[in-house]
UniProtKB/Swiss-Prot annotation:
A motif ('KMSKS' region) lies at residues 576-580. A motif ('HIGH' region) lies at residues 42-52. Its EC number is 6.1.1.4. InterPro entries: aa-tRNA-synth_I_CS (IPR001412), aa-tRNA-synth_Ia (IPR002300), Leu-tRNA-ligase (IPR002302), Leu_tRNA-synth_edit (IPR025709), M/V/L/I-tRNA-synth_anticd-bd (IPR013155), Methionyl/Leucyl_tRNA_Synth (IPR015413), Rossmann-like_a/b/a_fold (IPR014729), tRNAsynth_Ia_anticodon-bd (IPR009080). This is Leucine--tRNA ligase. GO terms for cellular component: cytosol. Signal peptide: none annotated. Belongs to the class-I aminoacyl-tRNA synthetase family. The keyword Thylakoid does not apply. It is found in: Cytoplasm.
Amino acid sequence: MQEHYEPDALERQAQTWWDEHQTFRAREDAPGEPFYCLSMFPYPSGRLHMGHVRNYTIGDVISRYQRMQGRNVLQPMGWDAFGLPAENAAIKHLVPPAKWTYENIAYMRGQLQRLGFGYDWDRELATCRPEYYRWEQWLFTRLVKKGLAYKKTAMVNWDPVDQTVLANEQVIDGKGWRSGAPVERREIPQWFLRITDYAEELLKGLDGLEGWPEQVRTMQRNWIGRSEGVELEFEVPGEAPLTVYTTRPDTLMGVSYVGVAPEHPLAARAAEGDGKLAAFIEACRHTKVSEADMATLEKKGMDTGLKAVHPVTGEPVPVWVANFVLMEYGTGAVMAVPAHDQRDWEFARQYGLPVRQVILPAEEGVAVDLDQAAFTDKGVLIESAQFNGLSSAQAFDAIADFLEKQHKGRRRVNYRLRDWGVSRQRYWGCPIPIINCPDCGPVPVPEEQLPVVLPEDVAFDGVGSPIKRMPEFIDTTCPECGGKAERETDTFDTFFESSWYYARYTCKDADGAMLDERARHWLPVDQYIGGIEHAVLHLLYARFFHKLMRDEGLVDGDEPFTRLLTQGMVLKDGAKMSKSKGNTVDPEALIERYGADTVRLFMMFAAPPELSLEWSDSGVEGAYRFLKRLWKQVHDHVQGGAAPALDKAALNADQQALRRKLHQTLAKVSDDIGRRTTFNTAIAACMELMNELGRFEDKSGQGRAVMQEALETTVLMLSPIVPHIAHALWSELGREGAAVDQPWPVVDESALESDTVELVVQVNGKLRAQIQVPAAAARAAIEEAALADENVQRHIEGKTVVKMVVVPGRLVNVVVK
C-alpha cells in the first residue's frame, strides 16, 4: 500500500470500477425493496456551483446508505433544459440556444461524474429533447379535451421594444430589464390549467406529508389560501352589478366606498367621458403589480363618479378606481371598510373618505383610536341596524343568511390560489400543441402528429420569438376541418417540464406512452432533495401534475414525494454565493487540488443539511487533513501484516473499551445518517473515533484484531460520504469485493455492555472529576471512590462534608461548607 494519500488517481480508479461494473444501474428485478432517491435536477447553465455540489452530495450519501441497507436504489440525473438564460446567452454569444444548452449539458455531466455521484446515467434525460416533451404535449391535449386546460385573456407585462412578455422579476423600476423600455400592461390570450379544481385536494394532501418540513407545508397552505366568506353584489344603476368577496361580512355596515381594479370593465366605461380618469388608468397600466408589490405600493385612486347601492341599507356608495385592487385576484372589485381594514383606512385618509366604526372590541376597556389606525380585530357589532350587539362570529352567519334570503349574496369558500397560466411568449420552450383555426378555434394537435418539434437551428436576436417569423413552422391545416390554420407559437412555462420529470426517469425509454408499469414500481419518490426556494411553485405544480397523471391512470397514489429535505444555501462571507457578488468558489479547482472526497466531506461536515453552510477554506483544509490521517492510519496498520481473527472472549479491558467506543459510534452514525440525516454529527462521531484509534497503541494479536474491525467499520461508515477513498482502503485492508457492495455494518449489542460506568463528580454543583466505578457498585463504594479522587480532595480540603447526593449511573455531588 502506498504511504501517501493521492486522491486524483484513486478517485479515477474507483469511478472506472463503478462504470465497468455498472454499479449504479437500477433494475426493476434486482433484489431488495425499491428506494427512489432524487435531487432536483439542474438548469444547464454551464458550470456546477457549490449549491449543486451540496444538493447532490446529500442525495448521494442517502442513496449509498440505503444501498448498504439492502434497498434496490434508483438515483437518476437529468437537465431542466428550457428557459430564458439560454435565450440571453444566444444574444450575448451569437449561438442558437440549443447549441449552447447541449454543450453545457456535456460539460456539466463530466463535472458530476468527477464528483463520483452514483447516478444511473442510462436514465439521463433533457427536457428540451422532443422524445421527452412530446409526452407533456400529449397530456396537455388530454387536459384540453377534459376542460382542465383553457384559453382566456390575461394581463401581462409587455416589452414594446423586445416584443415579448416579461415575468414580474424581469421588470425593474417599471422598465424592461434588457431593453430599458417602459413596460406596458397588456391583455393577451393565454392558456391556463385549472389547478383550482384541485385546490381542496392539494390542501388536504399536505396533512399526510409527514416526511416534509413543516415550513414547506405551511408555505403551501398559505399559497393555496383557503378562506370562508361571503360573495355579495352591489347594484350599480345602469351597469352590471359589482361582485365582491369578503371574509368579514360582519363589517358590511361600515362600507364607505367600493374599489375596482384599473382594468375592470366598469372603470373603462367610466373613463370613456373622463380624460383625467382615462389618464390615471393608463398610468396604472405601466405600474408593475404583483401581490408582493402591493404592500409597499403608494395607494392611489380616483372617483369614477358612479355610485353602487349598499345591499343592506340601500345607501349610495362611491365607486373608486384603486391601484391596489388586482383584476387577476377575485372579482377585481373590493368592498372597502376603512375603520376595520388597514389598507382601506390608508386610502380613505388620503382621499378624505368616511371612516365608519361598526365593530367594538369584545373586551371592555380596550381603546380604539381610528385617527391612528384601523381596528382590525373581531368584536361586537354597533351602528349595524338589526345586527347590533352580535359578535363577529354570530354576525357572519346572520348577515350571510340575510343576503342569501334577499338573493344578494351567498356563502363561499375561496382560494388565494389562481389557475396556472402556462403560456410563455418565448422561443426556447416546449411548443404548445394547439392549431388555431379561423373556423374551428383552437384545436389540439392529434396524437399521431406529436411531438410538435421546436426548430433548433434558428437565428436568435432577442426581438420576439424566431418561430413567429417562420411560415414553415406556423402554416398548417386544421385537423378538424382541413382548412388553412396556424400553429400556436407560444411555449410552455418551464415549470411544466419539471412538474413530471421525476416520473419519466422511471421509464425514460417508454416509447408508446408517457409512463409505463415501471412508474408504479418506483413511485412515489422516497426521498426528494432541493432548495427551500422551490417550496411553493415547483413542489405545488409537481403535486398537481401527479394528480393529473393519476386521473389519467398513469400513476398510483396521490403524492409524488414521500420525504422532502430542503438543504440550506452555501454562503461566503455571510452572503449567498453569486457571480455578481464575486464570492463564488469553483468546485473544479477544489477537486483538482484536494480531490472529490474532500469537497464532499466538507460539504457534509460544515453544517446540518437544512441550515445554510458558511464556506471556509480552513474547513476544506481540515477535511483534507482528516482523509490523509485516515489513509495513514490504515497504511500503518496494514504494514504490520494480516490481523488475526477477533476473539471477543479474549479481550482485555482496553480492547473492550475500544470495541465499545466503535459500536457506540456505529449506533450513532447509523441513526444520524439513516433517521436524522444529520451527516455533520455522523462525521464528527467518526472523527472522535479516529482520535481514539490514534491513541490505541496495542500491537498484540487481539489488539490488532480490534483495530482491523475498527478500521473496516470506519471505512464502511464513511463510504457513503467519501466513497473513493473507502473503495481503495477496503481492498487495502484485505477485504474481498468492493466497499460499495458491502452491507451496512451491524452494531454488536454485547460490545456496548460495560462492567464499569463513568460518573461525574461535583463539589457544590461544580464539575471537579470523572470517575470509573463497577456497574454494580454499592452507594458506599461510589461515595468512597468520589472522595478519593485527587482533584475532589483539593476542593474539599479544610471543609466539612455536609451530605453526598448520588444519582446512579450519572453523578455524585459532594456538598461541603
